[in-house]
């Protein structure tokens, strides 16, 4: 009887831990967003340009990183939380 109780408690504990890890991973995915903008390269002020572009579509990000992909486009990686 002791072994069965221990097994059930252990199973419930592991289930709770795994569900919490999945929630944290899902929340992290919502915090980061990447998008390609075809309005030219990053230039000298790429971070602010990315923030303005994301603000027009979603909301204002906390931090952005601008990467030149081509002469005519840039990739913006932004963090929202």
Curated annotation (Swiss-Prot):
<keyword id="KW-0713">Self-incompatibility</keyword>
<feature type="disulfide bond">
    <location>
        <begin position="64"/>
        <end position="78"/>
    </location>
</feature>
<protein>
    <recommendedName>
        <fullName>Defensin-like protein b</fullName>
    </recommendedName>
</protein>
<dbReference type="InterPro" id="IPR010682">
    <property type="entry name" value="SCRL"/>
</dbReference>
<feature type="disulfide bond">
    <location>
        <begin position="50"/>
        <end position="76"/>
    </location>
</feature>
<feature type="signal peptide">
    <location>
        <begin position="1"/>
        <end position="26"/>
    </location>
</feature>
<feature type="disulfide bond">
    <location>
        <begin position="42"/>
        <end position="66"/>
    </location>
</feature>
<dbReference type="GO" id="GO:0005576">
    <property type="term" value="C:extracellular region"/>
</dbReference>
<comment type="similarity">
    <text>Belongs to the DEFL family.</text>
</comment>
<keyword id="KW-0732">Signal</keyword>
<feature type="disulfide bond">
    <location>
        <begin position="31"/>
        <end position="81"/>
    </location>
</feature>
<dbReference type="GO" id="GO:0060320">
    <property type="term" value="P:rejection of self pollen"/>
</dbReference>
<dbReference type="Pfam" id="PF06876">
    <property type="entry name" value="SCRL"/>
</dbReference>
<dbReference type="InterPro" id="IPR036574">
    <property type="entry name" value="Scorpion_toxin-like_sf"/>
</dbReference>
<keyword id="KW-0964">Secreted</keyword>
<keyword id="KW-1015">Disulfide bond</keyword>
<dbReference type="GO" id="GO:0007165">
    <property type="term" value="P:signal transduction"/>
</dbReference>
<comment type="function">
    <text>Involved in self-incompatibility.</text>
</comment>
């Amino acid at each position: 009887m002791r072994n069965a109780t221990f097994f059930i408690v252990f199973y419930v504990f592991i289930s709770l831990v795994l569900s919490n890890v999945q929630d944290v991973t899902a929340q992290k995915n919502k915090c980061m967003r990447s998008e390609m903008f075809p309005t030219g390269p990053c230039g000298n002020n790429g971070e602010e340009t990315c923030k303005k572009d994301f603000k027009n579509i979603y909301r204002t990000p906390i931090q952005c990183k601008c990467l030149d992909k081509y002469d005519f486009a840039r990739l913006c990686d932004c963090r929202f939380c």
